[in-house]
């Protein structure tokens, strides 16, 4: 930071916003090609471009923060605000799904048989796999908090252990959810019940996969001694995101699985 007299990070010109925008265009065009022409070539190209962009952009962020020291307290404050706003936007995203669910379930139309779940739908038992999923995510919330406290206290081994447990629980949750989808007696095309169930729980599952990936990156960074007790925003952001995923699941469980059944 010797070459500047302020605490802010003046970012160097980067190609990643451009390649990110290109990947978004390729993915959306690819989805249309897949839906209408059953061709996945453009979609795969878009997904590959997106993955490469994310990998290289975040690699640059890690270089700037860990090795070049650009992430001063002022910069970290801005990143914190950014992460908080991102999580708020995700809350509003899920609010739309809950709105759709309650709009359909609180006043079922005659087409649904005037009842909820609609006539002919056999909902999943909330006291079986969904309850196990709930306990798995709650346990992962405890282990990520243990990891955070261990990091604050400078206990590297405990932090790695707790982080590994959290990742394992996240993967276990994803596998349970996949098996539940496979065995579900209804599909996404079974009216508004199937739509709201699979879209809401499916997007939550996607967020669990994203959160698990975020934590895996943090795990490998910690193996390379990237985090200290007073400089670890990358891990902190991952922990906040994981707690958000946790809370959304509790609302999904109570609304869709328990009350909705």
UniProtKB/Swiss-Prot annotation:
The gene is MT-CO3. GO terms for molecular function: cytochrome-c oxidase activity. It catalyses: 4 Fe(II)-[cytochrome c] + O2 + 8 H(+)(in) = 4 Fe(III)-[cytochrome c] + 2 H2O + 4 H(+)(out). Pfam families: COX3 (PF00510). The chain crosses the membrane at residues 16-34, 41-66, 73-105, 129-152, 156-183, 191-223, 233-256. InterPro entries: Cyt_c/ubiquinol_Oxase_su3, Cyt_c_oxase_su3_dom, Cyt_c_oxidase-like_su3, Cyt_c_oxidase_su3-like_sf, Cyt_c_oxidase_su3_a-hlx. Belongs to the cytochrome c oxidase subunit 3 family. One of its GO terms (cellular component) is respiratory chain complex IV. Residues 35-40, 106-128, 184-190, 257-261 are mitochondrial intermembrane. It comes from the Eukaryota. It is an enzyme of class 7 (translocase). This is Cytochrome c oxidase subunit 3.
């Amino acid at each position: 930071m010797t070459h500047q007299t302020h605490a802010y990070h003046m970012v160097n010109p980067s190609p990643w916003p451009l390649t990110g925008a290109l990947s978004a265009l390729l993915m959306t065009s690819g989805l249309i090609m897949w839906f209408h022409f059953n061709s996945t070539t453009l979609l795969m190209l878009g997904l590959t471009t997106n993955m490469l962009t994310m990998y290289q952009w975040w690699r640059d962020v890690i270089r700037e923060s860990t090795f070049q020291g650009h992430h001063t307290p002022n910069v970290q404050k801005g990143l914190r605000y950014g992460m908080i706003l991102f999580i708020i936007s995700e809350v509003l995203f899920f609010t739309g799904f809950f709105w759709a669910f309650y709009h359909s379930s609180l006043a079922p139309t005659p087409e649904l048989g005037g009842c909820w779940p609609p006539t002919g739908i056999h909902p999943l038992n909330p006291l079986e796999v969904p309850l196990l999923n709930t306990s798995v995510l709650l346990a992962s919330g405890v282990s990520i908090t243990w990891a955070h406290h261990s990091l604050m206290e400078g206990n590297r081994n405990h932090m790695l252990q707790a982080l590994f447990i959290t990742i394992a629980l996240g993967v276990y949750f994803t596998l349970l959810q996949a098996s539940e989808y496979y065995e579900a007696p209804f599909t996404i095309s079974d009216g508004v019940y199937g739509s709201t169930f699979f879209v809401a729980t499916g997007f939550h599952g996607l967020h669990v996969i994203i959160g698990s990936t975020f934590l895996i990156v943090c795990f490998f960074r910690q193996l390379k001694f990237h985090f200290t007790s007073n400089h670890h925003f990358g891990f902190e952001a991952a922990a906040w995101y994981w707690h958000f995923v946790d809370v959304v699941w509790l609302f999904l469980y109570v609304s869709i699985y328990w009350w909705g059944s």
